[in-house]
């Protein structure tokens, strides 16, 4: 019997960087105001690329040296797809020539990558099989650029992993996926309204967020989900090498580390450079750490996400 493992990670960010000072030219804000509340200094904004374009770049990097025909599954976690249909994953499939892959998008907002990784691990049962799991977002198209409470937070980007079913021992050790639909009103984007026939197609609603409630949710529920995940695996907090969090707000990461009574060094962050890239953030962070040699084969890692739904998720993985 063989088991699924993360064989490779990759990331892709648009070239165009927008600093806090740049934003202060178009809205009432400042570098100090943004940094002290979020930890963000800059973010990448797509100019001509859509979500599928970012995801395709990641997929091509992941499949370098691999036979695309051997890919069984492509999942793209996104809340900012190119269109309602076709799925972003189908566009990725066509671009890389993965003709045998089942393809679909998964929408769980900022928990999406962890959700997608768990789904892929459970679906990938063919020995030697491969899956592409990608988080990709162009959130800039859902932002109200006059609303400083949300516009300063988000950036565009993509990250992903190649999962292979060829390990001789388990690498995906435990997971917890949670949803709290009664809290949905605290974070939303992209709503449409029913239109009487033959009413016009309406624009998508921009981000709306109750920051105080989302902060409260994240700093309480994420530690609970992580603790439950580790208990399922019989692993202690101190045994985990890295906690790779959804990069929403540096203050949230610090508070979760404090609640778990763990050193902040175990919670690496790149939010200062990229902002909140939603479903892409954990994958971007993992790829960046792997490139720098800070996440290596054998490391015990917790991937954790939280966001719209509201949702929270944790996955314990041996790299």
Curated annotation (Swiss-Prot):
Free-text function comment from the UniProt entry: Catalyzes the condensation reaction of fatty acid synthesis by the addition to an acyl acceptor of two carbons from malonyl-ACP. Catalyzes the first condensation reaction which initiates fatty acid synthesis and may therefore play a role in governing the total rate of fatty acid production. Possesses both acetoacetyl-ACP synthase and acetyl transacylase activities. Its substrate specificity determines the biosynthesis of branched-chain and/or straight-chain of fatty acids.
UniProt organism field: Lactobacillus delbrueckii subsp. bulgaricus (strain ATCC BAA-365 / Lb-18)
Quaternary structure and interacting proteins, as annotated: Homodimer.
GO biological process annotation, one example: fatty acid biosynthetic process
Cystines in this chain: none
GO CC terms: cytoplasm
This protein's pathway: Lipid metabolism; fatty acid biosynthesis
The organism's taxonomic lineage, starting at the top: Bacteria, Bacillati, Bacillota, Bacilli, Lactobacillales
Entry protein name: Beta-ketoacyl-[acyl-carrier-protein] synthase III
EC number: 2.3.1.180
GO MF annotation: an example: 3-oxoacyl-[acyl-carrier-protein] synthase activity
Recorded catalytic activity of this chain's protein: malonyl-[ACP] + acetyl-CoA + H(+) = 3-oxobutanoyl-[ACP] + CO2 + CoA
UniProt cross-references to InterPro entries, sorted A to Z: ACP_syn_III_C, ACP_syn_III_N, FabH, Thiolase-like
Region (ACP-binding): 247-251
Free-text domain note: The last Arg residue of the ACP-binding site is essential for the weak association between ACP/AcpP and FabH.
């Amino acid at each position: 019997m063989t088991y699924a493992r993360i064989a490779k990670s990759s990331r892709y960010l648009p070239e165009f960087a927008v600093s806090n000072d740049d934003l202060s030219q178009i809205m009432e804000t400042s570098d100090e105001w943004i940094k002290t509340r979020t930890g963000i200094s800059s973010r990448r904004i797509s100019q001509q690329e859509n979500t599928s374009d970012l995801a395709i770049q990641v997929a091509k990097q992941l499949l370098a040296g691999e036979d695309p025909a051997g890919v069984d599954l492509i999942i793209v976690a996104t809340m900012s797809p190119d269109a309602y249909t076709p799925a972003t994953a189908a566009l990725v499939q066509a671009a890389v020539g993965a003709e045998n892959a089942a393809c679909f998008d998964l929408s769980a907002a900022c928990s999406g990558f962890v959700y997608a990784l768990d789904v892929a691990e459970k679906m990938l049962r063919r020995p030697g099989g491969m899956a592409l799991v990608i988080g990709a977002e162009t959130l800039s198209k859902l932002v109200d650029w006059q609303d400083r409470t949300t516009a300063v937070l988000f950036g565009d980007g993509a990250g992903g992993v190649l999962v292979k079913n060829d390990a001789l021992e388990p690498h995906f050790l435990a997971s917890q996926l949670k949803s709290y639909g009664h809290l949905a009103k605290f974070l939303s984007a992209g709503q449409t309204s029913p239109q009487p026939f033959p009413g016009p197609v309406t624009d998508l609603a921009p981000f709306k967020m109750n920051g105080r409630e989302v902060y409260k949710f994240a700093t309480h529920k994420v530690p609970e989900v992580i603790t439950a995940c580790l208990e399922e695996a019989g692993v202690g907090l101190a045994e985990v090498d890295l906690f790779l969090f959804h990069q929403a707000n540096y203050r949230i990461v610090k508070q979760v580390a404090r609640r778990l009574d763990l050193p902040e060094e175990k919670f690496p962050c790149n939010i200062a450079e990229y902002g909140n890239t939603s479903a892409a953030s954990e994958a971007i962070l993992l790829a960046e750490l792997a490139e720098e040699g800070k996440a290596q084969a054998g490391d015990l890692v917790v991937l954790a996400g939280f966001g719209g739904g509201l949702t929270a998720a944790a996955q314990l993985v041996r790299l």
